[in-house]
Amino acid sequence: MSSKQAASPFTCKAEGEEEMTGDLASREMNECKDQIMASHLPLHPLNHNKPHSEELQSLVTTLPADLDWDSMISSQHRMDSESNKLRSLYSFRTSSTSPHKPDEGARERSDLMSSVNFGTPERRKGSLADVVDSLKQKKLEEMTRSEQEDSTCVEKILSKDWKDKMDRLNTSELLGEIKGTPESLAEKERQLSTMITQLISLREQLLAAHDEQKKLAASQIEKQRQQMDLARQQQEQIARQQQQLLQQQHKINILQQQIQVQGHMPPLMIPIFPHDQRTLAAAAAAQQGFLFPPGLSYKPGDNYPMQFIPSTMAAAAASGLSPLQLQQLYAAQLASMQVSPGAKIPTTPQPANAPGTLSPTGMKSEKRGTSPVAQIKDEAAQPLNLSARPKTADPIKSPTSPTQSFFPMSKTSPVSLSNKSGIPSPIRGPSLDILSSLNSPALFGDQDTVMKAIQEARKMREQIQREQLLTPHSIDGKLPINNMGLNNCRSDKMLLDAVTGKICIRSAHTERTHFENLGPQLTGKPNEDGKLGPGVIDLTRPEDVEGGATVVEARVYRDTRGRSSSEPHIKRPMNAFMVWAKDERRKILQAFPDMHNSNISKILGSRWKAMSNQEKQPYYEEQARLSKIHLEKYPNYKYKPRPKRTCIVDGKKLRIGEYKQLMRSRRQEMRQFFTVGQQPQIPISTPTGVVYPGTISMATTTPSPQMTSDCSSTSASPEPSIPVIQSTYGMKLDSGSLGGNDLMNGEDEMEMYDDFEDDPKSDYSSDNEANEAVSAN
């Protein structure tokens, strides 16, 4: 289309040329007009088929040539040139679609020339003019047709919709479409608002998710940091524990070295009185760790009623070490102090403490503060002391205190060893001979002195045995309890600084002197009623003679309180409750034979309280009648009540049952920390077969001789054992040997208790029940 529009200026030029040459060629071409038209008709469609640009260019090139020919040559030449042009034009058109051949062009040219040359010259001129005219007309028609085609193309480009829009395009309509109607504006605002809210919610969701991710990451980082801190703390704690273990091991090594180096210096012996949990653990550890070596045997004369440990161990116990650490410390001490061949433990002799001979009777006339039992009662709450009064006497300051001999003053006094017991007794086996066990150079440094002392002691023992055979009546199978105390540890004793502590050993001369002085009270003659004297252990019974670990309990016979042994026991008159309960108790026992007496008493007490005064009236009348009869029968009767069965522990007043439960719980707690091994008791027999069990006996988990309880009940079940050392203080001597001292230890009358049930019937026991034997629980 652009080519057609560009061809329009050329068409104008052709029209101007046509006007200039029209007059000249009109006359020449009139004659041959028909022929030329006939010959050129087939060319029209070819011209139409050609593009307009090519067609116009060919015409533009031919028109100047025609003008030159008209002016220069004749019409003949003009016709020839025209015919040549036409032939060349035709050949060009045909060559546009097919390759040009020279022979074909020559043939066409000859044919055309023959056709053109046909006729007269006038006719040829006319035909040429006609051809030119026809060409001009065709060109004009083509120009008009091209203009029409241009207009149709524009119309096609501008579609009807576009025309409509262009027609409606004005300022008012444009402004209206831009501004819009109120409804459209409201709709658009609503859409915008919803879109804004959606965007805001989406933004909030994104922010929340981002915050959650941040929090999660922060929490993970915090957890990791905490785990790292925990691991670091655990590592530090492990390092501290290892450091503490190393320090403790170092301390143990130092203590072992001190014990080995300073073994010749007697350590300060501190008694262990378990009053709280820490010292309970220390005492149990002492019981476990500081046991006597198995080579030493002990007899009734062993003056060792309390467990002692070195001051270093007591300081360790008081420093708050854990039970495991104490146990390790004691085990290390024990391992370092084991007696082995070649080891030398020097001895420390003890000088004469006080002149004269001290008898147990004289010791009993002293205050209780001079005996170790007073110190025990002052230091700790014990089960047997239910109404103890504080003692202010210091046993260490007293010249007659047995503990005075535990602290040596000099090392120059002679050493004398003897049998542990003042009672001459043959030895059943070599393992039981303490002199044989002591006859070792590993125990003492000065071997010559030791051997001399041992020989002298053996001679004295043989002499005592001969005297015993001559006077067998001096020992009648009875041993006063007081003879086994600490009171006989006197000036002529020595301190054997053995493996675990101080062992006070009597000399044979002192033991013989004491037995000569105590002849009347060693007879152990039965009383008028056939019972043994008070405070005497009957070792002639079959179950007691077997001795050793088979001795499960010690039979102790107590005398009647507040009267001599010859006075009969006077029962109190029954009160109204007892009159009523006598028959009721019998009924309950018939219905329930296995019911315990304490439960029956509880039932009877509740029933008595529920009774009315009218129901109780006949029983009160019976009480008055019985009281009158009792007063007539015993006009000088005076009731001496027993002390209340209560005890004060840690400032609290407890009944005996509560106290036993407390002690049982403490023992159970102590067993959780320590396991005390069994130390069997070594019996020592006389020629008559009498067995004297050692006064130092360790209580074990199995039934073994334990401390005799002054407040034990016959109906109480055996309690779990506690590591104690059996003390035989608190017993009575025979009234004849005391020389008028009816009480056991002067002012301490109220500290001995008879066992009885809580029910009032115990006040109405018979004479035979007053001296019943009580088993030590």
UniProtKB/Swiss-Prot annotation:
Basic and acidic residues: bias regions: 100-111
From the Swiss-Prot or TrEMBL record, state where the protein is found: Nucleus
Does Transcription show up as a keyword for this record?
Answer: yes
Read off the Pfam families from this record.
HMG_box
Q: Which UniProt keywords apply?
A: Activator, Developmental protein, Differentiation, DNA-binding, Isopeptide bond, Nucleus, Transcription, Transcription regulation
Identify the stretch(es) annotated as Disordered.
1-33, 92-127, 342-424, 701-777
Presence of the UniProt keyword DNA-binding in the record: yes
Q: What Gene Ontology molecular-function terms does this entry list?
A: DNA binding
Where are the compositionally biased (Acidic residues) regions?
745-758
Task: Give the GO terms filed under biological process for this record.
Answer: cartilage condensation; cartilage development; chondrocyte differentiation
- Which Gene3D superfamilies would you find in this protein's record? High mobility group box domain (1.10.30.10)
Q: Which InterPro entries does the record cross-reference, listed alphabetically?
A: HMG_box_dom (IPR009071), HMG_box_dom_sf (IPR036910), SOX/SOX-like_TF (IPR051356)
Please provide, in alphabetical order, the Gene Ontology terms of the cellular component aspect for this entry.
Answer: nucleus
Residue ranges with Polar residues bias: 398-422, 701-729, 765-777
Q: Which residue spans does the record list as DNA-binding?
A: 570-638
Q: What does this protein do?
A: Transcription factor that plays a key role in several developmental processes, including neurogenesis, chondrocytes differentiation and cartilage formation. Specifically binds the 5'-AACAAT-3' DNA motif present in enhancers and super-enhancers and promotes expression of genes important for chondrogenesis. Required for overt chondrogenesis when condensed prechondrocytes differentiate into early stage chondrocytes: sox5 and sox6 cooperatively bind with sox9 on active enhancers and super-enhancers associated with cartilage-specific genes, and thereby potentiate sox9's ability to transactivate.
- Protein name, as recorded: Transcription factor Sox-6
